[in-house]
Amino acid sequence: MASFRIRQFQERDYKQVVDVFSRGMEEHIPTAFRHLLTLPRTLLLLAVVPLAIVLVSGSWFLAVVCIFFLFLFLWFLASKPWKNYVSKCLHTDMADITKSYLSVRGSGFWVAESGGQVVGTVAARPVKDPPLGRKQLQLFRLSVSSQHRGQGIAKALTRTVLQFARDQGYSDVVLVTGLLQQGAVTLYYSMGFQKTGESFVDILTWLVDVSLIHFIYPLPSAQKYEL
């Protein structure tokens, strides 16, 4: 098993961090596309539109061409939420990681390093408006390079955030992940996270049925933890 270490983000990591994160998100596009093809509304679209063209024009060739363009359109729909998400992240908090995380009290950004290369990332920062009486930390940007999965890196990065939350006196760690990100969903359940709900970001994510799962990991108080 290849060795790795978890450490705090440094400015020299930026390009590799962006690459690991972007690739990690966009690799879910094929899964989203296959999922979209199984939806009843998609199957209805693929059946009705070509049939209508045959009935109107009498041309099977036009129907085949129509199916080809429908598949292109469906690929575009499946990929759009993931590309939008990556673009939004790179233009907001990940545009300046030091400013967004390392310069903010109670926040952090860590990388997993193996062989001198960044192979994983994770970030955390305080929830702005937590429930009354709770101090919550939100986990963000968990991603591991596809060539380094199965080595426990994602679990180690998540544990780093949990330990940070304990040390900082947080009451909960919360996060949101996509239903189609089955590796992440399985990881969080195995580590004791509890599902609190599901949601859609917008009409596009509803249309392609890419829902988000909300998780929480309750922590003992700092005082209890020290005991």
From Swiss-Prot:
Reactions performed catalytically: L-lysyl-[protein] + acetyl-CoA = N(6)-acetyl-L-lysyl-[protein] + CoA + H(+); an S-substituted L-cysteine + acetyl-CoA = an N-acetyl-L-cysteine-S-conjugate + CoA + H(+)
CDD domains: NAT_SF (cd04301)
InterPro entries given in the database record: Acyl_CoA_acyltransferase, GNAT_dom, NAT_camello-type
EC number assigned by the record: 2.3.1.-, 2.3.1.80
BP GO terms, sorted: gastrulation with mouth forming second; glutathione metabolic process; negative regulation of cell adhesion; peptidyl-lysine N6-acetylation; positive regulation of gene expression
Transmembrane annotation, as ranges: 36-56
Tissue specificity note: Expressed in brain (at protein level).
Positions in the Cytoplasmic compartment: 1-35
Residues exposed to the Lumenal side: 57-227
Ranges where the N-acetyltransferase domain occurs: 69-217
Recorded GO MF terms: L-cysteine-S-conjugate N-acetyltransferase activity; N-acetyltransferase activity; protein-lysine-acetyltransferase activity
Protein topology in the membrane: Single-pass type II membrane protein
Pathway(s) of this molecule: Sulfur metabolism; glutathione metabolism
Major localization class: endoplasmic reticulum
Gene Ontology cellular-component annotations: endoplasmic reticulum; endoplasmic reticulum membrane; endoplasmic reticulum-Golgi intermediate compartment membrane; Golgi apparatus; membrane
Keyword terms: Acyltransferase, Endoplasmic reticulum, Membrane, Signal-anchor, Transferase, Transmembrane, Transmembrane helix
Localization: Endoplasmic reticulum-Golgi intermediate compartment membrane; Endoplasmic reticulum membrane
Family: Belongs to the NAT8 family.
Name assigned to this protein: N-acetyltransferase 8
Organism encoding this protein: Mus musculus
